[in-house]
Amino acid sequence: MRKKSKEYNSNNKINSLIRLNKYISNSGICSRREADKFIEAGVVSVNGKVITEMGYKIQKTDIVKFNDSTIKSQQHKYLLLNKPKNYTSSFKDSFKKNSVMALVRNKCREEIFPIGKLDKKTTGLMLFSNDNDLTKKLTKKSLKIKCIYHATLNKNLQDIDLKKIKEKRWDDYGIKITDIAYANQKDKKEIGIEMIGPTKNVIDKIFETYNYQTTKIDRVYYAGLTKKNLARKESRFL
């Protein structure tokens, strides 16, 4: 019995190990790739010993220093917000009353940041996290993220223009429209548009190409996430 207990404790110790670059990334300082560069440069120490070995593993109780300052790893948080209209999404405006940061700042102890941005008039899904690796991944221009928007126009969208929008190549904007349809056949000002690629500010430009103006834009789907059961201005952890 004692032998089994010893093996169990040993396994627990192994399972509790974490890669040094991940620990640094979890602290919010940088991404894992950037952490590797700092480790290689010799500015990271563990329990007083400089570590330059790639793939080095530590225990969470170890003392890790970056440029002689102790850092602490933190748990990753992921928060989904249904952004209201007239709120800014820039982190630079985080202390303004109409900033999305004012809506999420007190949701957790960890400091979380918006992943991507929506312009002031656009409503809908926004993701917040302290996960640097995920943030860098989702904000890469080369990454093809699927989004669905509900747009309201200033006038009915003609069938011929809907077809043109769907068939046109939008390479200049770095996006691909995979589907577009009337959200309501009785009101052709209400449009659902599905696209892949970076989408900030492109909805306006798409419709302006055919002399339409958007009066409302709502992001209803983002990277596999929906706003089901999430009221405007409300948020929830994933």
Which residues are covered by each model-predicted region?
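Basic, flexible Lys/Arg- and Gly-enriched helix-loop patches that mediate nucleic-acid binding at interfaces
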Residues: 2-238
